Regions:
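Short coil/turn connectors at secondary-structure junctions
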Residues: 1-2, 7, 24-30, 63-67, ...
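Fold-independent oxyanion-binding glycine-rich loops
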Residues: 6-9, 15, 34-36, 72-74, ...
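Conserved active-site and cofactor/substrate-binding residues in soluble primary-metabolism enzymes
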Residues: 17, 24, 51-55, 63, ...
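Flexible, low-complexity linker/loop segments at domain and module junctions
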Residues: 129-131, 206-208
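Short, flexible loop segments at boundaries between secondary-structure elements
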Residues: 133-149
Length: 208
């Protein structure tokens, strides 16, 4: 069974034709359509046309895709009545279990994953177009035992290894952290959340 990633821009441009061909060939494949609300390959522009996760789900069902699952970081923004018959609406945390389920299905299945692109989210926050959570996450190095469960749960690049005298531990790279907070799902008492705090700006380097 094959899992194939596809962005929403690619789907809108020509990717739907590949899905149609896979359905005709009865290929055992799951298309993971990433609805990230921006055309990443050309600079983060908005989609040039009417498209939404529920529209994609209905199109996939109309093309003959056997199972369609819509995963979202905010499932409450969608209504199951807007989905085609047989489609499922779940929180993004169910991704692993959904993939394990769909790999057992013969033929074409699809996951529509609805989450704004991390880079686009950061860009909008800087421009005041999206709320910026006034919370930051830190890891207490003295408590961390380096188990790595925070990285396993979040799969986040901002959870970085730190070499200490007591071995490798973990830290949050604040410069790249996108405030997704998935790392807090790690089974660990070392996390500290700070409300309303701001990062200290580094001192300017004097010119030589």
């Amino acid at each position: 069974h094959v899992f194939q990633n596809m962005g929403d821009g690619t789907y809108y441009h020509s990717g739907s034709l590949a899905i149609r061909a896979a359905v005709a060939a009865k290929t055992p494949v799951t298309f993971k359509i990433l609805y990230n609300d921006a055309v990443a390959m050309t600079g983060g522009q908005a989609m040039d046309g009417p498209l939404s996760p529920t529209i994609i789900a209905r199109q996939l069902a109309a093309e003959g895709v056997q199972r369609v699952v819509l995963l979202s970081e905010e499932p409450e923004r969608h209504s199951e009545s807007d989905l085609p018959a047989g489609a499922t609406l779940l929180h993004r945390d169910a991704l692993d279990s959904v993939q394990r389920e769909l790999r057992e299905v013969e033929g074409v299945t699809a996951i529509v994953f609805d989450q704004t692109c991390a880079a686009e989210k950061r860009r909008r926050r800087k421009r005041g177009l999206m709320p910026d959570p006034q919370r930051r996450v830190f890891i207490n190095e003295a408590v961390c035992e380096g188990c790595g469960d925070c990285g396993t749960q979040s799969n986040c690049l901002s959870v970085t290894p730190v070499e200490t005298e007591l071995g490798r531990k973990r830290a949050i790279d604040q410069s790249s952290c996108n405030k997704d907070f998935s790392c807090l799902k790690g089974f660990c008492p070392s996390f500290v959340t700070v409300e309303g705090g701001r990062l200290k700006k580094p001192k300017a380097v004097e010119a030589l």
